[in-house]
Amino acid sequence: MTEPRFELTDDLFTPKEVSWLAFNERLLQEAEDLSVPLIDRLKFLGIYSSNLDEFFRVRVATLRRLAGLGFRSREFIRHDPKQVLDQVMREAKRQHARYNALYEQLIVELGEHGIHMIDELAYDEQQASFVEAYFHKIVRHRLHPIMIRGRGDLPPLVDQAIYLAVRLSDSRGKRKPRYALMGIPTDVLNRFVVLPSRNEEHDLTYLDDVIRYNLGSVFSLFPHDTHDAYMVKFAKDAELDLDDDIQESYFSRISRSIKRRGFGSPVRFLYDGSMPDDMLDLLLTKLKIPRDESLTPGARYHHRSDLMNFPTVGKGSLASPERPAVAHPDLPTDGNYLRAVRRPDVLLHFPYHSFDHVLTLLREAALDPKVRSIQICLYRLARNSSVVNALINALRNGKQVTVIM
């Protein structure tokens, strides 16, 4: 008896992009888990958002490129890239709705524990004075508004940055509205500002709302008396383009491709869904963004990856306690790691062991005259990476440094 033939057809396989979205949705399940401390649940939302940003910049960007190849795309992917792209956008939209509902639920739960996220309309007199002082001392000099004029295009926006699109209007209707775009400096300031609070309550506000409250000061040169602001976020194609120039080294091609990353085509434009249509049309025209599936209407606040840095306020039980990392007993406390690692293998288990061990090893290697080269594989880097600083120092000391990302 012959065994039945089993044919592997494309419909038996789930596209990896769709599978990845299901993987990332596990973070939403963690955020819904009542056994997880409340502030940790918020941080899971931040991790979800950060992962999704990178997914759109790389995987969705690649799908768009493949969709533009037509039938030739089947050389690189089993499924029709247009169909996969449609499936991805539908699933992302479904998860986006789940995410927003979960965020609102967690904000309510924070309130039940005496932690309140308030906007610029809810500041009391003491908080308003604090916000004004904080704005002028800390925030004002970091703002660089760009006026949107009738002629000319806007300069390229910074990838993954968040902006306030501002409309200046005259309540008496005597002057035409004016428009501006202004970046929110979350690269140097915490997105969350802790306000003066009473009793055992804790009031926090978004940095965005601190800026909204002070828009009259920012645009004091203009006679308009009404200021409306809507958040937008821009994600660009971050896939690497490698030229086929065999006369050039792979390193040179990678370097040039990374430099071009900031000028990629838009793959996602997230905007406040309450923005007036005429204002949205103006932005799309000036930024040369088509009205297609890359447009994503959202809520008042974007860039929720900042939730990973939500302040630990309130009772200690609302966040997991920090566990101090311990030193490895087989590594010396006075340095000379290069000699130590020549002995039996040392297993470091993070985050339980201190990452300082790795930094110490790299810093020693950067200085040791016997070290000629350093090769290292890195998966993810901090914004201000001590690892990168150590590797740069090694380069300055004449070492050859190779990093695989």
Regions found by a protein language model. Give the residues of each.
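N-terminal localization/anchoring segments of enzymes in phospholipid and broader phosphate metabolism
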Residues: M1-M405
